[in-house]
Amino acid sequence: MIENLKTNYTGTGHRKQAIARVYLTPGSGLIEVNGIKGELYFQYSPNYIRLSKSPLTTLGLENKYNIYVNAHGGGLTGQVEAIRLGLARALCKLNPENRTALKFEGYLTRDSRITERKKYGLKKARKAPQFSKR
């Protein structure tokens, strides 16, 4: 489905362990993630749907482009935020003038917080075993 599209703009987003490749094509506002309708993939959560389409809403282009996404890794929230970043980057390729509005809203900033590694001698990343004085 993505291969035969005439004009498409792509953007990649990362969040935690999630990676999303977003393909933007002229259309009617459809969103499709991994070949599944967006509403079904996001479990009919209005918050997830709103978050993933928020860059389009900011620019007033909700029903002008279809969004096709390949997402893998992480959980649903991480994937939604990766989709949002990828969509914002694709919109910048579409029209460089969109960059200022998207940057102002913070959609072009990659959230760099990732899981801290577990250290030896500790139970988790920071949790130490119980200390006994005697």
UniProtKB/Swiss-Prot annotation:
List, in alphabetical order, the Gene Ontology terms for molecular function in this entry.
RNA binding; structural constituent of ribosome
Localization, UniProt:
Plastid, Chloroplast
Q: Which GO terms describe its cellular component?
A: chloroplast; cytosolic small ribosomal subunit
Which residues are listed as membrane-spanning? none
Pfam families recorded: Ribosomal_S9
User: Per the UniProt entry, what is one GO biological process?
Assistant: translation
Report keywords, A-Z. Chloroplast, Plastid, Ribonucleoprotein, Ribosomal protein
Residues annotated as coiled-coil are none
Chloroplast recorded as keyword: yes
Classification via PANTHER family: RIBOSOMAL PROTEIN S9, SMALL RIBOSOMAL SUBUNIT PROTEIN US9M
Q: Which family does it belong to?
A: Belongs to the universal ribosomal protein uS9 family.
Entry protein name: Small ribosomal subunit protein uS9c
Q: What is the lineage of its organism?
A: Eukaryota, Cryptophyceae, Pyrenomonadales, Geminigeraceae, Guillardia
